[in-house]
Amino acid sequence: GVTYVNINGEIIKTLLPDMSNISIKEINILDIDNRQFLQSIDKDLQQCIKDEKYKQLIKTVDSDEKVCILKKEKSSDCPSAFLITVQSKEDTQLIWITGDMRKEDLEKLLKKL
């Protein structure tokens, strides 16, 4: 199946008060454990990453898991965006974080999620 979760910035501030120095507009999480569905959207996802000019920050490959963190630079009308993909044998998670933060802030946030 597919599970979608949206967390707005106000809830994040309430849940993580020690992260008040960063400005997160929202976090969107898509959890996919349907291989057919994932294969059908993979090409579209790769094209979106290319079109939106995401840059890879980190990529790790473990024996059973791949993690990739990409960043889209902010423009005058849009804040920064991060896309985190976590792929394992069982499922894949796509996590979009929209807001202004440094790499160190992102690492701190990910440890809390």
Identify what each model region corresponds to.
Residues 102-112:
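Short, low-complexity, Pro/Ser/Thr/Gly-rich segments in the mature regions of secreted, periplasmic
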Residues 70-103:
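A short, solvent-exposed beta-edge/loop patch
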Residues 1-44:
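Early exported N-terminus immediately downstream of N-terminal targeting peptides
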Residues 2, 22-24, 62-64, 78-79:
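Extracytoplasmic
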